[in-house]
């Protein structure tokens, strides 16, 4: 620019012929564009704007759908967690009930075995005492028969001794 100014060419000087031809050329270009391309350009711009608006609307609907899906997922997760807690609690209750039942059954079984053993011991004791009494009766009969030197009938003397032992048992009980 310094060179142009030095050579005497003035850039700031307005040339009226150049201004007119520039305006005429510009007007012709605008007219040609308006006549042949303006509608197509506007139509393309409108299509582009509607496409962008459609994409925005689609993105918004996808966002809403994603939020809805996320909420449903969180609800399902919450329900699944609650169900899992319920199942665990129920399993704990079942385990406690089963433990109580098994403990009670074992206790009852032990009690039954103990009662059975006590009955068997009592029966064995009764048989042993009965056998001892019978032996005592027999020995008493033998001793008494030798002492008296008289042979009594064994059954008579045995019944006599049994009656006497029964009297002694009654006295012991009182």
From Swiss-Prot:
Pfam families in alphabetical order: ATP-synt_B (PF00430)
Topological category with respect to the lipid bilayer: Single-pass membrane protein
Residues annotated as transmembrane: 15-33
MF GO annotations: proton-transporting ATP synthase activity, rotational mechanism; proton-transporting ATPase activity, rotational mechanism
Annotated keywords: ATP synthesis, Cell inner membrane, Cell membrane, CF(0), Hydrogen ion transport, Ion transport, Membrane, Transmembrane, Transmembrane helix, Transport
InterPro entries: ATP_synth_B-like_membr_sf, ATP_synth_b/b'su_bac/chlpt, ATP_synth_F0_bsu_bac, ATP_synthase_B_chain
A GO cellular component annotation in the UniProt record: proton-transporting ATP synthase complex
Main location: membrane
Domain of life: Bacteria
Localization of this protein: Cell inner membrane
Subunit and partners: F-type ATPases have 2 components, F(1) - the catalytic core - and F(0) - the membrane proton channel. F(1) has five subunits: alpha(3), beta(3), gamma(1), delta(1), epsilon(1). F(0) has three main subunits: a(1), b(2) and c(10-14). The alpha and beta chains form an alternating ring which encloses part of the gamma chain. F(1) is attached to F(0) by a central stalk formed by the gamma and epsilon chains, while a peripheral stalk is formed by the delta and b chains.
Physiological role: F(1)F(0) ATP synthase produces ATP from ADP in the presence of a proton or sodium gradient. F-type ATPases consist of two structural domains, F(1) containing the extramembraneous catalytic core and F(0) containing the membrane proton channel, linked together by a central stalk and a peripheral stalk. During catalysis, ATP synthesis in the catalytic domain of F(1) is coupled via a rotary mechanism of the central stalk subunits to proton translocation.
Family, as annotated: Belongs to the ATPase B chain family.
Full protein name: ATP synthase subunit b
Gene name as annotated: atpF
